[in-house]
Regions:
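Peripheral peptide segments
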Residues: 1-160
Length: 160
């Protein structure tokens, strides 16, 4: 399974790893947290400046977004992203989740027949509400699991 998260306008003010750079954004931090629960084989950030960005790559803050780019620039950006995906061994036929807006997905769609666009048709408020619900379900499941397995008697009863 592949997961691609888009970069965000809100960023750290200092050089850091890519997944840390965008954490000041509630949208990114919630998307990243939820995406990690899906246990992907590959997970990258789609960066307007850096194209395909491994989570641990160190980068400096920048101020550029694809929303300001022309259609031709977005198409060239996507071609470079696909080239980088190939060099990173991304399986284009694998189930793929995009946590990204239209500008980041429009020219990548054709490469991923088994894609799911997590933000499609939703406004920012809907996306945030949806992520809150998803993260709430994950938290509740984890809490229930911990209750069951943290009690020795419960574990023994479960095994028998």
């Amino acid at each position: 399974m592949n997961i691609f998260l888009s970069c965000t306008k809100e960023k750290e003010s200092k050089r850091c790893r890519a997944h840390e750079m965008y954490m000041p954004s509630s949208l990114f931090s919630k998307s990243y947290t939820y995406a990690k629960t899906l246990n992907p084989d590959k997970m990258y950030i789609l960066s307007a400046k850096h194209h395909l960005l491994p989570l641990s790559r160190e980068i400096a803050p920048y101020n550029y977004t694809l929303k300001d780019a022309s259609a031709e620039e977005r198409k060239e950006w996507a071609e470079e992203v696909v080239k980088q995906m190939k060099s990173h061994g991304v399986d284009f036929n694998a189930k793929t989740y995009f946590f990204a807006g239209e500008a980041y997905i429009e020219y990548l769609r054709e490469y991923f027949p088994n894609r799911k666009e997590m933000y499609a048709g939703k406004g920012i408020g809907e996306i945030m509400h949806w992520l809150d619900k998803k993260l709430g379900s994950v938290k509740e499941s984890l809490s229930n699991w911990l209750k069951i397995y943290s009690n020795k008697d419960s574990v023994e009863n479960y095994i028998e």
